Amino acid sequence: MVKAVAVLNSSEGVSGTILFTQDGAAPTTVNGNISGLKPGLHGFHVHALGDTTNGCMSTGPHYNPAGKEHGAPEDEVRHAGDLGNITVGEDGTASFTITDKQIPLTGPQSIIGRAVVVHADPDDLGKGGHELSKSTGNAGGRIACGIIGLQG
């Protein structure tokens, strides 16, 4: 069993912990607890770079090793890092579990060392018709992020 963690920080008062686990070649399970967000849907993605020197802006684009267009987690055509939306309750917190086969913790396409990002707005899953739908899901600004690191 491989385990990883990302601790989310932001200048906007958002904080949280995202745990990743993968058993062999099985899909990766993502368990998250985040607080300080506005209620509603927020885009949630793995971004290509584990660089936070300029805050969440330096994490690069969505992780996309296959060079595909943006989509929903269940779509065949999607970025590997497209994990859809998280739902934030009226109290500003989100607790969620995602299982995904395109974000391995080992091998050449591992997400270790990359970043996880929470966006300000809902991800339209590539179906919104906006000019940014097919690249970012038109999910708005990056309000919290953390680097995915191996856990002992």
Curated annotation (Swiss-Prot):
It comes from the Eukaryota. SUPFAM superfamilies: Cu,Zn superoxide dismutase-like. Cu cation binds at H45, H47, H62, H119. It is an enzyme of class 1 (oxidoreductase). GO terms for biological process: removal of superoxide radicals. GO terms for molecular function: copper ion binding; superoxide dismutase activity. Its main location: cytoplasm. GO terms for cellular component: cytoplasm. CDD domains: Cu-Zn_Superoxide_Dismutase. It catalyses: 2 superoxide + 2 H(+) = H2O2 + O2. Keywords: Antioxidant, Copper, Cytoplasm, Disulfide bond, Metal-binding, Oxidoreductase, Zinc. PANTHER family: SUPEROXIDE DISMUTASE CU-ZN -RELATED (PTHR10003). This is Superoxide dismutase [Cu-Zn] 2.
